[in-house]
């Protein structure tokens, strides 16, 4: 698996890189893991509702992933796995549960206890949502992925119903631990842990 850290990047550029990697995997190339932070952007999934955009001046980017409207910005660790799911069971539900499990165990290793909520994709603590997940597939190659709140400004989330949930509070690793963390501090940990976790829980 290729691991690429592309730093802080605009959404359109990140999408372009994903599409290039997806095409390579479709042609039998190596799977990839993109690690990044986005410049501030609101996105909305293919089935998302405009009703969840509370600020009428907002124009979220419509993208080919599941889920509703969300915010991405500095302080979020965004991870886009580009995986050949045709060789991993062709089960999108199982893949979503795999990502949740990875996040729960990753955060536990950092000292933050979190959990999933039945019927709601993502990861929570008792204080709010810690990570959001939205994926898409093209000919059974995955794109998009998860966004883990490390130390983002949470104010932009007030302009939307995050993930389509009016009651959704937002938390972060920094808020949970009471100390400031940085995305760059976690990239290596995610890169090291993701591949063996993938082979264990979602083998080819």
From Swiss-Prot:
Pathway info: Protein modification; protein lipoylation via endogenous pathway; protein N(6)-(lipoyl)lysine from octanoyl-[acyl-carrier-protein]: step 1/2
Disulfide links within the chain: none
GO biological process: protein modification process
Catalytic activity: octanoyl-[ACP] + L-lysyl-[protein] = N(6)-octanoyl-L-lysyl-[protein] + holo-[ACP] + H(+)
GO molecular function: lipoyl(octanoyl) transferase activity
All copies of domain BPL/LPL catalytic, residue ranges: 27-202
Sites where the protein binds substrate: 65-72, 132-134, 145-147
Similarity section: Belongs to the LipB family.
NCBIfam families on file: lipB, PRK14345.1
Name recorded for this polypeptide: Octanoyltransferase
Gene: lipB
